[in-house]
Amino acid sequence: MLRLFNTLTQEKEIFEPLGDVVGIYTCGPSVYQYAHIGNFRTFIFEDVLVRYMRFKGYKVKRVMNITDIEDKAIETAKTEGKTLRDLTEYYSGVFFEDMKTLALLDADVFPKATGHVPEIVKIIKKMMERGFAYRGKDGSIYYDVSKFGDYGKLSHLKLHAGKKKIKRDEWGEDTSIISDFALWKSYEKEDGEVFWETELGKGRPGWHIECSAMSSKHLGKRFDIHIGGVDNIFPHHENVIAQNFGAFGENPSRYWLHCRHLMIDGRKMSKSAGNFYTLHDLTGKGYKPMAIKYLLLSMSYRKRLNFTFGELEESSRKIEKLRLVIERLKKTNGEDDAEKIVMKAMKKFELAMDDNLNTGKALKIMEEFADEVSQIEPNKVSVEKILETFRSFDSILGLGLF
């Protein structure tokens, strides 16, 4: 029985789907820079969730948005002398190549924010009609946080009053303030050619409203799971809940899942701190993509993971050992019966995954299983059962063992 830790309730809850198809919305990449391996820790966790749900027989529809309009993207395009479209298409292409390199499954839909402006306008109008949004003196349209009594329940923070209104996508160093936030940003000359002429006026969408528009279009007003990194909890996901309540009267998602940070030398890996590695950085040093993936799965997504090259070397050795065990098995034709070993390993693996996708424990179980089968000479039937068990593990973890 699958249990997932719900950020909203701060409890592990039995997963109960809302309908026949499990709807999952992923906050995808902001495509103004290369994604680093800390970003990919979250995307790998999400990939494993989808794989495991399908393994358990669920039908899944996964939507991963592409954030191709935001303050930082506009600023970066201007600095690099590129159009916003050229910039975001380049980094989107790199991201998709990285996904393939890491053997991540494609989402069912990859919606772009720039392709959903009509939906964004419609939702904002609905919020204005319902009294949750207003036009500021600067011409921008803001969400009135005072109208939503549950604001702050996702983040569980002690929030305090900040500025009356915040127009920028990010709120600076202070991430525990209550402020009205921009849904539609009125045009400024710094925006250059990035604007839309709509019934809301000349301008562009705020960052938070994009996810409300894309999730509701592709998954409906209410779906099963909303996923992201812990940095998304506040203000982004808090604001998404507020927006959806303002437009539709309900929280969009039943379960909210968030992946913890990847650390490096005890500090959060981030673009702003400049202490990050991209997939290309590490493969350029000779490390194989699946070893990197193995390391990123080596601890539960609910715990911080500290990246070191020593741990990466160890992950390289572990995955190579698994491959050698599998290759040896393909040539084995002994007399030992491995049915009990297989059944025990599969049961333990599923228990670990059912416990909030504990991939760290699942990897250890797979390693122990490899050690056990290495000590016997299984017969032909047992060899097939062992290999099938490894295939099941691999179909869930996506490590390319076959």
What residue ranges belong to the model's regions?
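Structural preference for alpha-helix termini/caps and helix-kink/transition segments
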Residues: 276-402
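Alpha-helical recognition segments enriched in aromatics with Gly/Pro capping
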Residues: 1-32, 47, 118-328
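Short catalytic-loop micro-motif centered on adjacent basic/acidic residues
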Residues: 62-63, 108-111, 226-228
